[in-house]
Amino acid sequence: MHEFQFVVFSNPVAGREAEYNRWYQEQHLPDVVKVPGVVSAQRFQLADNSTMAHRYLALYEIRTDNIEAVMQDIYGRVGTAEMPMSDALDIEGVAMHVFAATGPKVCK
């Protein structure tokens, strides 16, 4: 079984941050975690004053021997009843990347 991180950078539509945060935390993360192979999801907000293009980050931990199949499953659910999207998400500005673990997790 291989480990991956699906990394998603995003922003809300101007003036709709509360709606975006509510949808992302209460609807979207639980929907993505229902996909077989996705074992956890967590969101982060930019904590410093840097001028990054994105203010929000979502990390999805995936364990699978077939990352292409898991990603195809995720993308296939987007916009369906299994994974409804919110128009409070600035979809044009979303950046998504999949990273494969290069070694074991180091913990304290």
Model segments located where?
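Macromolecular interaction modules
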Residues: 1-108
